[in-house]
Amino acid sequence: MSLLTEVETPIRSEWGCRCNDSGDPLVAAASIIGILHLILWILDRLFFKCIHRRFKYGLKRGPSTEGVPESMREEYRQKQQSAVDVDDGHFVNIALE
């Protein structure tokens, strides 16, 4: 006799479980956690690009400019832009002496 026939048997035209511990709170908690894990995994696969792009680039917004005068903000922007212009898409080699 297989395990399948011992556990799942047709009862009144539907499948039922003859497990004695099916009302155990631990089993219910494990089922809920399993279902939540499956839902989160599906959402992660559906929105992979959005979620991971948010974590990867969303946290790198640069220093806060709150309370900094506008002239200093503009100076900072110009420094950042000049650093990008100098690099021009190539690696910068730094020689240590």
Curated annotation (Swiss-Prot):
Residues 44-97 are intravirion. Glycans are attached at residue 20. It comes from the Viruses. The modification Phosphoserine is found at residues 64, 82. A lipid is attached at residue 50 (S-palmitoyl cysteine). It is a single-pass type III membrane protein. Pfam families: Flu_M2. Residues 60-84 are annotated as: Disordered. GO terms for cellular component: host cell plasma membrane; membrane; virion membrane. One of its GO terms (biological process) is protein complex oligomerization. When the channel is activated, one or more imidazole moieties of His-37 probably become bi-protonated. Forms a proton-selective ion channel that is necessary for the efficient release of the viral genome during virus entry. After attaching to the cell surface, the virion enters the cell by endocytosis. Acidification of the endosome triggers M2 ion channel activity. Belongs to the influenza viruses matrix protein M2 family. Homotetramer; composed of two disulfide-linked dimers held together by non-covalent interactions. May interact with matrix protein 1. This is Matrix protein 2. It comes from Influenza A virus (strain A/Swine/Tennessee/24/1977 H1N1).
